[in-house]
Amino acid sequence: SDTMVSIIMLVHGAYEYTKNTIETLQMTKGNYELIVLDNDSDCKTKKLLLKLFNKGMIDKLVFSKTNTLFAKGNNIAFKLCSDKSDKVLLLNSDIDIRNPYWLQEMLENYEKGILSLGVCEKPPYVRVDGYCFLIDKKLYEKYRLDENFEWWWSITKLQAQVLNEGYKVKGVKDHSNLLFHYGGASGNDFQNSKGMQTDDKDIIKWFNEKNIDIIDKIDNDNYIFNSKSKANRIYNKLKGR
C-alpha cells in the first residue's frame, strides 16, 4: 500500500537499545518516515542519534532540553509529521524488529482507529499497549495524548476516546514473529509523573463499556532474529539467560 506512516520515537538514554531499534528498523518494507525526539539523554546517546541522522536512518531529529516524558514528547514530535502521512505510529526505543513486513502486516490488519502490538490484560480494563501503537493521524490530531497523564494512562485514555467515537481499537496478543519489546529500558522517571495515581474507577468510566478487539497472532514467517546482537545479549544477561 502507498500509505505513508509517520513513526514517532522518543529516546531517553538506553544507548544500546536505541541503537538496536533504529538499526533493525532499517529492514522495514513500506513507506514511512522516522521522527525522533530526544528527551534530554546523555551525550553518548545524543551523539549516536546525530550519527544515525547523518546516515539517513532518522528523517527528523529534535533535542529537548528537558525530559518531556511520554505524552508531551509524542505531542511535540507529532507536529513534525509530514503532510503526506495519514497514520502515526508511536514506537518505543527498546524494540528489536524481527520481520521486514511488520509494518505492512499492521497496515493490512488495521481498520480505522488504532492497531497496537501488545495487549495489557491487567486490571482495571483490557487495553492495548503503547510501545508499537498505530493510529489514524486525524484521530491523533483531534485528541492528542492527554498531558495530565504523562505516562501510559495517556495511551489508555486515547484508545477509550477512539472506541467511544465508534472506531476500532485492535491489539495483537502474540507478535513475537514481528518484533520484540525489551521493556523498562529508559529508567524510572515515570513513577513520579503526573496522572500515575489515577483511580481504577475513572479508567473504567473512560471506556463506557466499549471493548478492544484482540487478534491472537498475525501470520507471517519472514522472521529474522539476531541472537548475537548486543541488545539481545544485554537483555538475556539481565534476564539471567
Task: Describe the function of each predicted region.
Residues 1-24:
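N-proximal low-complexity "stem/linker" segments adjacent to membrane-targeting elements
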Residues 23-32:
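Short, acidic, metal-binding catalytic loop of nucleotide-sugar glycosyltransferases
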Residues 32-41, 62-64:
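Short beta-strand/loop segment that forms part of the nucleotide-sugar
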Residues 38-47, 96:
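A conserved acidic beta->alpha catalytic loop
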Residues 64-81:
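Glycine-rich, basic loop-to-helix element that forms the pyrophosphate-binding segment
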Residues 85-96:
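Short beta-strand-to-loop acidic/aromatic patch adjacent to the donor-nucleotide binding site
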Residues 112-121:
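A short, conserved acidic/glycine-rich loop-to-beta-strand motif
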Residues 149-152, 156-241:
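C-terminal catalytic/acceptor-binding lobe
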